[in-house]
Curated annotation (Swiss-Prot):
SUPFAM superfamilies: Translational machinery components (SSF53137). This is Small ribosomal subunit protein uS11. Keywords: Ribonucleoprotein, Ribosomal protein, RNA-binding, rRNA-binding. Pfam families: Ribosomal_S11 (PF00411). It comes from Idiomarina loihiensis (strain ATCC BAA-735 / DSM 15497 / L2-TR). One of its GO terms (biological process) is translation. InterPro entries: Ribosomal_uS11, Ribosomal_uS11_bac-type, Ribosomal_uS11_CS, Ribosomal_uS11_sf. The gene is rpsK. Belongs to the universal ribosomal protein uS11 family. GO terms for molecular function: rRNA binding; structural constituent of ribosome. Gene3D superfamilies: Ribosomal protein S11. Located on the platform of the 30S subunit, it bridges several disparate RNA helices of the 16S rRNA. Forms part of the Shine-Dalgarno cleft in the 70S ribosome. HAMAP family: Ribosomal_uS11 (MF_01310). PANTHER family: 40S RIBOSOMAL PROTEIN S14/30S RIBOSOMAL PROTEIN S11 (PTHR11759). GO terms for cellular component: ribonucleoprotein complex; ribosome.
Length: 129
């Protein structure tokens, strides 16, 4: 019995003028997510997913490449302006913002949303190398 071919509709990409870029910069990796104003993800990229492994993953250059990839993927939605939210202490904080600017987005606002404890949990012990 032959299957009747089901017609698949091509998804229409919605056009968004303003968006938000969430940069999560940890010590080991950098994750960039570009969302619309409601927080729905449009594109994302990581330093590890951009071809960097091990200690090279935690470099500013890896964060720059990841931000460029996420920025190019989000171009399909017609984004022009970005509001950047930076979270974490990692080395890719500044380079990812510069890369998003170089892709062609107008950055309207940069906000640091790193959670700062009011003397909460005990931090990890200092490394002895």
């Amino acid at each position: 019995m032959a299957k009747t071919p089901t017609r698949s509709r091509k998804r229409v990409k919605k056009q968004v003028a303003d968006g938000m870029a969430h940069v999560h910069a940890s010590f080991n990796n950098t994750i960039i997510t570009i969302t619309d104003r409601q927080g729905n993800a449009l594109a994302w990229a990581t330093a590890g997913g951009s071809g960097f492994r091990g200690s090279r993953k935690s470099t500013p250059f890896a964060a720059q490449v990841a931000a460029e990839r996420a920025g190019e993927m989000a171009k399909e939605y017609g984004l022009k302006n970005l509001e950047v939210f930076v979270n974490g202490p990692g080395p890719g904080r500044e380079s990812s913002i510069r890369a998003l600017n170089a892709v062609g987005y107008k950055i309207t606002n940069i906000t640091d949303v790193t959670p700062i404890p009011h003397n909460g949990c005990r931090p990890p012990k200092k490394r002895r190398v």
